[in-house]
């Protein structure tokens, strides 16, 4: 199934959180929080101003982003959990080695 976000909305696939802490301790599934990091899958065209001008999106498909853990609406696409959120809910784009899968 395909989903095309409208206006300034973004479709994000959550990236899995770490299984182990920096100190080497394993985190059980019951103690894990939902990750607040994800990969942008699709973006809408952007937001329109009151006079009709289009403000383009700052993120693009493939970007790794950091977002508020309460952001967005959860949707399942082909059995995989995604979030639909406004671009304003995205806190930062992660670049470099940290952002790679």
Curated annotation (Swiss-Prot):
Cell compartments where the protein resides: Cytoplasm
One BP term from GO: chaperone cofactor-dependent protein refolding
Any one annotated GO CC term: cytoplasm
A GO molecular-function annotation: unfolded protein binding
The keyword Cytoplasm belongs to this UniProt entry's keyword annotation: yes
Keywords, alphabetical: Chaperone, Cytoplasm
Record flagged with keyword Chaperone: yes
Xref: InterPro entries: Chaperonin_GroES (IPR020818), Chaperonin_GroES_sf (IPR037124), Chaprnonin_Cpn10_CS (IPR018369), GroES-like_sf (IPR011032)
Family: Belongs to the GroES chaperonin family.
NCBIfam families: PRK00364.1-2 (NF001527), PRK00364.1-5 (NF001529), PRK00364.1-6 (NF001530), PRK00364.2-2 (NF001531), PRK00364.2-4 (NF001533), PRK00364.2-5 (NF001534)
Role: Together with the chaperonin GroEL, plays an essential role in assisting protein folding. The GroEL-GroES system forms a nano-cage that allows encapsulation of the non-native substrate proteins and provides a physical environment optimized to promote and accelerate protein folding. GroES binds to the apical surface of the GroEL ring, thereby capping the opening of the GroEL channel.
Quaternary state and interactors: Heptamer of 7 subunits arranged in a ring. Interacts with the chaperonin GroEL.
Protein name: Co-chaperonin GroES
Organism: Lawsonia intracellularis (strain PHE/MN1-00)
């Amino acid at each position: 199934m395909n989903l095309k976000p409208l206006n300034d909305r973004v479709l994000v696939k959550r990236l899995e959180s770490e299984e182990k802490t920096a100190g080497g301790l394993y985190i059980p599934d019951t103690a894990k929080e939902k990750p607040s990091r994800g990969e942008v899958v699709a973006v809408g065209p952007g937001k329109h101003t009151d006079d009709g001008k289009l403000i383009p999106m700052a993120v693009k498909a493939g970007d790794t982003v950091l977002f508020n853990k309460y952001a967005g609406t959860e949707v399942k696409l082909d059995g995989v959990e995604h979030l639909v959120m406004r671009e304003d809910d995205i806190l930062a784009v992660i670049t470099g080695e940290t952002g790679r899968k």
